[in-house]
Amino acid sequence: MMTYNKKYIDSVEYDLIETRKRMWMMERKKNEELLKKYQQAMSDLEDYKNLYMRQRSEMENYQRYIEKTINNIKANANADLIKTMLPVLDSLDAGILHDEKLKPIRSQLIKILSNYGLKEIESRGKKFDPYLNEVVGIVKGDDDIVVEEVQKGYILNNEVLRTSKVIVSKGGNNEQDNRN
């Protein structure tokens, strides 16, 4: 009977060992599957994180683009409106030559327009600047000095809106008038 029991015990022990091996193999296989799923989930998470960061960056760039576009539209709308006001300023300048009472009106209009970025180009007595001035006449005198402004020029938000039409002195030349 001992041999039978030993065989039985050996058999049970063998089954137990085999069952443990199978369980260990199943756990190992399950752990490997879980590890693969975990690694895939982490990879997917990284992909989604990168996608989110790209989308966020694109959205921020789009918002900056929209803000810039809106500012450009506002600036251009102001520029168009102010350009239409320049002939009014020219008329006031011409009127001031005949009636000094128009000076406060012109000053008030210039003050309002300066709130929108308009600045007058000061040219008289200064060296000629081709970016700010347009020569309409030349007289004898010191080289490249603006002696008279025929028409005021204006700068809007650091861009030339209209150049000043000026008469410039040139050394040794006879007086010429090239007005258009």
Swiss-Prot record:
Participates actively in the response to hyperosmotic and heat shock by preventing the aggregation of stress-denatured proteins, in association with DnaK and GrpE. It is the nucleotide exchange factor for DnaK and may function as a thermosensor. Unfolded proteins bind initially to DnaJ; upon interaction with the DnaJ-bound protein, DnaK hydrolyzes its bound ATP, resulting in the formation of a stable complex. GrpE releases ADP from DnaK; ATP binding to DnaK triggers the release of the substrate protein, thus completing the reaction cycle. Pfam families: GrpE. Belongs to the GrpE family. GO terms for biological process: protein folding. This is Protein GrpE. Coiled coil: none annotated. Transmembrane segments: none annotated. One of its GO terms (molecular function) is adenyl-nucleotide exchange factor activity. One of its GO terms (cellular component) is cytoplasm. Homodimer. Keywords: Chaperone, Cytoplasm, Stress response. InterPro entries: GrpE, GrpE_coiled_coil, GrpE_head. It is found in: Cytoplasm. It comes from the Archaea.
